[in-house]
């Protein structure tokens, strides 16, 4: 399977670049900006893309690629900061612009007398999305300008003449953003026409490739899977089951942090999938270890370690553990942006004890959420399972802010059940990517039946997203929110105030902890 390597210079759009490439039917993966040519060569990409980034190529903190990247014999496309890194490397000059460009801009395609740019084949003058304060002010030798804008005379360039064989291209704007009208066509021109990549990546091809890898990795060893009933672990389990059959045994852990009646619901819908599943009730153990623990990072790590402890009690010569880790989990947990900071450890990634007795099989770790659902459909998993909202590995422990206790978990369960029930009744459940309730560690004064109350505050959260990397808060109807609030306050003892979270990601994360 042919692939594309995206070198990440810290852009907020890096993951979007990878997704757009996959939408063209081409597999893509992200590596750090400073990956060595040897490391890149091991991945055998047929093209390389340099992402945007927040720094300046002439600054002290400049992030620059290894020059050997341009000598690997594959086409290279630089986007925004990536274009500026190309210009600097080949001897051009980049400087701060007196007129910065953020948002829509009109791109004018250059019509060169000698030959048209293959990158701009069938691309007319059109709107593009800019996001830069620096610009190329002197063209590197052996390059030509292929497009311009009002404030950027060199908003696209390519190697030419003596350097034509290098096939190096640069765009000052972002083709991966929807506001760039012909962005998808530009990426197609680069990847399919220039790099000659055959679009052969699809859910079906992914499944075939993963089945081969799983069989090769597991051999004849037994494998255990921690299944939660969520989309990720269910798809991972079914995929591994198709690869190794009865070698796989699943354990569903009731950690005491699940939604209302979750254990019964999960066991019921897992039955038709043909999986071997054991229900392990470890709720007392989890809640004991979480007693008086308020730090979200400590809660995540305790839960991760306890999961492994429970799995180890159910081992029967298994050598491997299956996890439904996704690409966003890996990106958020292990920075690929050089100096950027980790946002938070993921339950599947950072919470595992270092001396775990099991080796990992993570068949979905290179997929985004919507791709997992597509793979699930190809595997024949029912739509009502695939369209369940994401549920965090640590469960309600990260939705009860502060210390976790049975009474507080019960309050949250009842409130969350009402919220989800009303979403489904109103036909809104499938229109939001994720919805849940959060029990806050504060109380507020209220009045009920002419009596003063001092009870808990609950926050409702609903977001719209594609893959969880970015998200907008869902603009649910006011009358709907009023109905949910009224039901919760009247039906759930211990809550006298309901708030609605209108924060987007970024700057907020989807979960509160």
UniProtKB/Swiss-Prot annotation:
Enzymatic reactions: XMP + L-glutamine + ATP + H2O = GMP + L-glutamate + AMP + diphosphate + 2 H(+)
SUPFAM superfamilies: Adenine nucleotide alpha hydrolases-like, Class I glutamine amidotransferase-like, GMP synthetase C-terminal dimerisation domain
Keyword Hydrolase: no
EC number: 6.3.5.2
Domain GMPS ATP-PPase: 201-388
Example of a GO MF term: ATP binding
Residue ranges of domain Glutamine amidotransferase type-1 in the record: 3-200
Pfam families in the record: GATase, GMP_synt_C, NAD_synthase
Keyword Metal-binding carried by entry: no
GO cellular component: cytosol
Residues where ATP binds: 228-234
Entry-linked NCBIfam families: guaA_Cterm, guaA_Nterm, PRK00074.1
Protein name listed in UniProt: GMP synthase [glutamine-hydrolyzing]
């Amino acid at each position: 399977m042919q692939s594309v390597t995206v070198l990440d210079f810290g852009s907020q759009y890096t993951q979007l670049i990878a997704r757009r490439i996959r939408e063209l039917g081409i597999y893509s993966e992200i590596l750090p900006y400073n990956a060595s040519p040897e490391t890149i060569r091991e991945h055998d990409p047929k093209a390389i893309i340099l992402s945007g980034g927040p720094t300046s190529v002439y600054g002290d903190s400049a992030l620059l690629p290894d020059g050997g990247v341009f000598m690997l014999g594959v086409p290279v496309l630089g986007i925004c900061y990536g274009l500026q890194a190309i210009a600097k490397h080949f001897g051009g000059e980049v400087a701060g612009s007196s007129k910065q460009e953020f948002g829509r801009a009109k791109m004018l395609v250059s019509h060169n007398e000698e030959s048209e740019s293959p990158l701009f084949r069938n691309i007319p003058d059109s709107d593009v999305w800019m996001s830069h304060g620096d610009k190329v002010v002197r063209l590197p030798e052996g390059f030509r300008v292929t497009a311009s804008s009002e404030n950027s005379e060199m908003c696209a360039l390519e190697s030419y003449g003596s350097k034509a064989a290098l096939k190096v291209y640069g765009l000052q704007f972002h083709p991966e953003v929807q506001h760039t009208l012909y962005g998808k066509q530009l990426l197609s021109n680069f990847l399919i026409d220039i790099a000659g990549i055959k679009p052969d990546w699809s859910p079906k091809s992914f499944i075939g490739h993963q089945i081969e890898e799983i069989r090769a990795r597991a051999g004849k060893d037994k494998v255990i899977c921690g299944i939660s009933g969520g989309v990720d672990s269910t798809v991972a389990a079914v995929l591994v089951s198709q690869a190794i059959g009865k070698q796989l045994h699943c354990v569903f852990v009731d950690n005491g942090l699940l939604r209302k009646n979750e254990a019964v619901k999960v066991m019921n819908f897992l039955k038709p999938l043909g999986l071997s599943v054991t229900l392990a009730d470890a709720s007392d153990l989890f809640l004991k270890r979480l007693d008086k623990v308020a730090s979200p990072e400590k809660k995540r790590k305790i839960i991760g370690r306890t999961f492994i402890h429970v799995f180890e009690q159910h081992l029967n010569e298994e050598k491997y553990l299956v996890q439904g880790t996704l690409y966003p989990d890996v990106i958020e947990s292990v920075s690929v942006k050089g100096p950027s900071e980790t946002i938070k450890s993921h339950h599947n990634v950072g919470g595992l004890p270092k001396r775990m007795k099991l080796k990992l099989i993570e068949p979905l770790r290179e997929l985004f959420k919507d791709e997992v659902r597509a793979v699930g459909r190809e595997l024949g998993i029912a739509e009502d399972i695939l369209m369940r909202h994401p549920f965090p590995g640590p469960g309600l422990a990260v939705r009860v802010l502060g210390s976790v206790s049975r009474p507080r978990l019960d309050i949250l369960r009842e409130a969350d059940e009402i919220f989800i029930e009303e979403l489904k009744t109103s036909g809104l459940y499938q229109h939001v990517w994720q919805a849940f309730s959060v029990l806050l560690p504060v109380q507020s004064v209220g009045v009920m039946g002419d009596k003063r109350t001092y009870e808990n505050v609950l926050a409702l959260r609903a977001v719209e997203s594609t893959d969880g990397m970015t998200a907008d808060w869902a603009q649910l109807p006011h009358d709907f929110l009023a109905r949910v609030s009224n039901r919760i306050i009247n039906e759930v003892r211990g809550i006298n105030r309901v708030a609605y979270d209108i924060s987007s990601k970024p700057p907020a994360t989807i979960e509160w902890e």
